[in-house]
Each structure stands twice: as C-alpha cells, then as structure tokens.
Amino acid sequence: MILNNRGFTIYDMGNPYEDLYIYYLENSPDRKEEHLLGPDFLGNWIEDGSSFLFFSKPSREFVQRLIDKNHKLKFNDEFYFTYEEWQGGRIEPIEVSRFYIIPPWEENPEINGKIKIFLDPGVVFGNSLHPTTRDSLKALSEIFKKKRFSNVIDIGTGTGILAIGAGLLGAEKVLAVDINPLAVKTTLNNVRLNGLEGIVEVKEGMAENFIGNQNDLLIANIYYDIILQLIKMGVFAKEKSFILSGLMQSQARDIKLELSKYPIEVIYEWNNNGIWHTILGRVMET
C-alpha cells in the first residue's frame, strides 16, 4: 500500500482482480463460516436465498469443505469470467461531469477542477460504466450546484459511488444502505479509500426501513419495482429532493405518473439513448 496525495491508502500491487471463479450454491452459508473458504475468497453475493461465492483462483475444494460442514448448502453450478467480462469492460479512470473516478490500482494523476473518487467496485454493480450510474452522478453534480445538503440517503448503494460522490460534493451526513452484505462490505472499503468515514455511514437493510425521515436528498438507482413500491407507500414524499435511476423508458413513464399524485416537481431528466432514464426532482412545500 502507498499513500496518495490526499493522505489515504491506495493499492500498489496492480489490479487485484483478473480471473473470477464463481460457485453457485442453494442457500447461504453463515458469515462465520466464510473463513473456511481460503485465501482467494473475494465475497458472497446473496440473491433470492442463493449464494454466489467469488474467488480469484479455482477453489472448488474449499467450497466442498464448506458444503460438507453445512448440510443445508447444495452445489448448483460454477462459472468462470475474466474481470473485464464480469464488469462489462475494462475498469479504468473515467471522467463523469464534475468527477474523475479512479480505480485504486491505477496511477493517481493530477486533475485540475475535478473531484476524485477512488473506487474499487470488486464484483458489485456500480463501476461508473453503466449509463444509470453516470447519469446519477450528473444529477448529483447538478443539484449540488444549487445548494448544499445536510443529510443524504443512498438506497441500494452498491459500491457506494453515489453516496461517496455526495460526500465529496459537501453533504454533511450521508447514509448508504444496501440489503446485500457484499455491497455493504464493498462500500465500506470505498468510503475508507476516499477518507469519508466521518461523513458516510453504511448500513445493511431494507430501503423502506430507512426512508421517510425528511432527508434533504434521496438517491435511488435501484430496481423499478422497489422505487414504485416506495412511492406508493407514501413515505417517499417526505423526502425533500430525489434522484431516481435504473429506469427504462416505460418504467420512467409509470414512475412519473405515480409521482404526479404528490406535490412533486420533476426538475430534469436524463435519457440515455432512449433506453435508460434518470429523474431529478423535489417535493414542493405545501
């Protein structure tokens, strides 16, 4: 590890991810059992009660050792990807609006007038390559031009990139929430990489348990069904401003229709090639 010019650590051994070996299990091991998975274990992505165990090297024998110990686990399949295949392209420095996003294994360049985000996405969604992530960063840049926010919540934080962006733009407190423990682990690492431990708090849990507290800004780059459910619950309208993303064209139309039932103003929309939509809006005072 080395110190960069902002005083926190970045990687000095190059990209730690080259090959990904993924083992798909029915059910999920206890976190206390993860020490059985050996030195090349990267993390466990839990989806619908199943586990996807990620390793940097072939590790079938470690997985079998875990299954032999925990009989509720069942081996389903295994996969191999290069890291670039998994992430949808090479992870390299990229400029998005006011931000310059740098993988911590890349050289830390001098960039004038840009806010640096050091981001290790691991195997989690949110690497700045996807249009919804980029447009959400643009929306953050736009809304922070108008005011500074005291408290921000980012639900479905993924890698934490949007929560970190809000913190670096000047938010006093940011809460980053995700239901997936691997996303929480990844976000915690990225918060440390950017020196934001005193600003960005990371929690594991359901989105509906954290919103409705009159946050200055809510960020949700998540599944359409969850956004729609949160709006219909009514607690969404207690937030003051919002960024909604992860929406396809017909979904964005349905979301705006649902928002129209509340005193809400859509400030701006980003439309990426007619496919992905991002909405920036605010709740009007009544």
Which residues fall in each region the model found?
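SAM-dependent Rossmann-like transferase core, predominantly class I methyltransferases
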Residues: E85-K146
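Alpha-helical structural signal in soluble globular domains
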Residues: S51-F52, K69, L169, M233, ...
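N-terminal auxiliary segments of SAM/dcSAM-dependent transferases
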Residues: I2-P109
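Conserved beta-strand termini and adjacent loop/short-helix elements that scaffold enzyme active sites
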Residues: E78, I102-P104, D120, K203-G205, ...
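Short glycine-/acidic-enriched loop or helix-start segments at secondary-structure transitions
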Residues: V63-Q64, I111, I164, Q229-L230, ...
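S-adenosylmethionine
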Residues: I179-E285
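Conserved SAM/SAH cofactor-binding pocket of Class I
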Residues: L129-M206
